[in-house]
């Protein structure tokens, strides 16, 4: 399971260092150059990564894109072509490249493609919008000293986990198919406390439907 080679890249992994000033998908994927009459991919390699993902061999494993320092530019701008795919109903939506040649106009994003992003929160970065936070899980890596008494058991994986197996456990579509309308009682009560407008409990935190489904899916797995 060699995910990357010596250069830090691989057929199933793409490392994209985000730059300041990206304003649209042309900075991330590329654009159709009408003067040259051809599509001009961005230097990120994202266009080639997506086109290579259409091969039969690439569909059998998970393919990862790492957005390094992702919020140096507004993520909603350069990822605008992908935001609609974060929901189940838009996962198969192709990207319009603007190419007038019909056979090359639409770029399909393989279902086994996933994004991982590293972000910072300081004066050099862009804040994350509520629209983005509602669609993705965010893990804070603040430095904390924790003393754990739990014993963890490690295990080894024999090769790459098939994509179909990962999709069955963690896929967005599976959450919709299983229908998570009924939350466990403890979780429902916790959400009620978050959304209680009692001043003594502090600021109100509204839990969106997407986040509720993500929590329910996590508990189910």
Predicted ranges, named:
Residues 1-221:
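C-terminal regulatory/interaction module of P-loop NTP-utilizing enzymes
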């Amino acid at each position: 399971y060699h995910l990357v080679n010596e250069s830090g890249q691989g057929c199933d992994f793409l490392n994209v260092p985000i730059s300041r000033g990206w304003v649209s998908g042309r900075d991330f994927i590329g654009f159709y150059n009408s003067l040259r009459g051809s599509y001009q991919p961005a230097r990120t390699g994202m266009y080639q990564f997506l086109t290579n993902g259409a091969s039969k061999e690439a569909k059998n494993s998970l393919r990862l894109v790492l957005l390094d320092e992702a919020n140096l530019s507004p993520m909603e701008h350069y990822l605008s072509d992908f935001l609609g795919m974060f929901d189940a109903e838009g996962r198969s939506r192709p990207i319009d490249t603007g190419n007038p040649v019909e056979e090359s106009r639409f770029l399909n994003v393989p279902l086994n493609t996933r994004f991982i992003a590293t972000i910072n929160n300081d004066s050099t970065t862009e804040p994350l919008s509520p629209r983005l936070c509602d669609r993705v899980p965010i893990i804070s890596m603040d430095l904390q000293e924790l003393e754990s008494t739990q014993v963890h058991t490690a295990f080894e994986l024999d090769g790459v986990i098939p994509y179909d197996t990962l999709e069955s456990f963690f896929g967005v579509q599976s959450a919709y198919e299983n229908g998570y309308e009924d939350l466990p009682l403890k979780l429902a009560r916790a959400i009620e406390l978050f959304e209680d407008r009692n001043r003594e409990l502090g600021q109100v935190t509204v839990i969106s439907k997407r986040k509720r489904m993500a929590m329910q899916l996590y508990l189910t797995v």
